[in-house]
Regions:
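Glyoxalase I/VOC metalloenzyme domain signal
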Residues: 1-47, 59-112, 127-181
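Short acidic/glycine-enriched loop/turn segments that link adjacent beta-strands
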Residues: 50-53, 119-123
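Minor-groove-contacting beta-hairpin "wing" of winged helix-turn-helix DNA-binding domains
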Residues: 55-57
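Extended serine/threonine-enriched, polar tracts that run as long, contiguous segments within proteins
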Residues: 114-117
């Protein structure tokens, strides 16, 4: 996805994306291998944070300069979904052909996976790796005006877009979005 550029904010001050992602895992090697072999991340630093080994990876091939910190943690309980946990980590590919190529690699390694799914606004594949992290890989957004609403300057003016398969749950989803902790 391209960054949202507006006249009111010069590009050098714009928020372009998420800074770092920290993945706390028991076994670092399987996750590191996926980042390097499947997504093109490069290991660029290692250090200790208290008693934990941390390995830093960077993706230099795009505007966002994504960075992932893998923290080795053999002591903490395995993460469960809920407050403080993440459901999945998402990556992008250039097109459907790249996604199909990645899907073949995933199936060759026998990762538990979803297969390729049409999500209306993008096409995705999901798989779980050895540390039980769920990886999503998606094509770029389909920029069809009928499917995706225009971006607005004010966040509260953007209508909630749901794919057709979730429309029957719209009321419940909107209620949960408005939930205050």
């Amino acid at each position: 996805m391209d960054p949202f550029i507006t006249e009111g904010i010069p590009e050098e001050y714009a928020i372009l994306g998420i800074g770092d992602i920290h993945l706390r895992v028991r076994y670092t090697e399987p996750t590191q291998k996926i980042l390097e072999d499947y997504y093109g991340f490069k290991k660029y630093n290692k250090f200790k944070f208290y008693d934990r080994k941390v390995t830093l990876f960077r993706f230099e091939e795009n505007l966002f300069k994504h960075e992932i910190h893998i923290i080795e943690d053999k002591d903490s309980a395995v993460e469960r979904n809920g407050v403080g946990g993440i459901h999945h980590i998402a990556f992008g590919v250039k097109d459907i052909e790249d996604l199909k190529e990645l899907q073949e690699k995933i199936e060759e390694k026998n990762y538990f996976n979803s297969g390729i799914k049409n999500r209306e606004f993008m096409i995705s594949s999901y798989f779980r790796e050895a540390n039980h992290l769920l990886f999503e890989t998606a094509t770029p957004l389909i920029k069809d005006k009928k499917i995706i609403p225009e971006q607005k300057n004010n966040f509260d003016e953007i209508p909630l877009f749901l794919p057709k398969f979730l429309e029957n749950r719209r009321e419940r989803i909107e209620k949960n979005i408005n939930f205050k902790f």
